[in-house]
């Protein structure tokens, strides 16, 4: 089970279509299940809104149904109240094998990501600049990585979805596992630059696995980006030198 809150002006822009707001609000919540090696079964939605146009709610409901159909899940309940636009989504699911937690990383494990980072950041930038690009959909309609979660359930020792930025989310694994991490910048699949590591909204997965499985895991299309080390903290090296970041990732209270 997981719960996510999406708020206007924070998690989505007021200019977005109601269908996209519904889709994004649900799929970003579903992604937490993928990050636990699980698949979704049903959800509930609580909507706070002061929008008066009936057509907005019709389109929002259409977006909900579209999302339910795509992921073969049921809506089992919810609530509506008046106030600033705010959507709370509770998601429930079951593990593909067993739950993959954030506290299972072991010293010497390899660190992987399931796909390229930074596309949603580029998409948001393009949307704000009224530029139509192939990356807009990465922000408007993020895809939870359930198929990849199923595949990595065979070997992952820990896992998390990259919602707040790789540096922050991998940092959570390190803290809960009482280990550190060392990453090779050149091996991380990013779209633009180092800011792709801290922006978030990627909804790819970051996971750890025993290093003797490196070749097998890479052959499945996953990206080896570093290793778990004993020294606490997270180190990113580029050309042998450490990279520092202005911030580690998304902060909901900023």
Regions found by a protein language model. Name each.
Residues 6, 39-125:
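Glycine-rich anion-binding loops of enzyme active sites
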Residues 106-115, 142-166:
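Internal active-site segments that recognize and position negatively charged phosphoryl groups
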Residues 51-74, 81-85, 92, 154-254:
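Glycine-/charge-enriched secondary-structure boundary and capping motifs
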Residues 1-34, 110, 248:
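N-terminal glycine-rich phosphate/pyrophosphate-binding loops that anchor nucleotide-derived ligands
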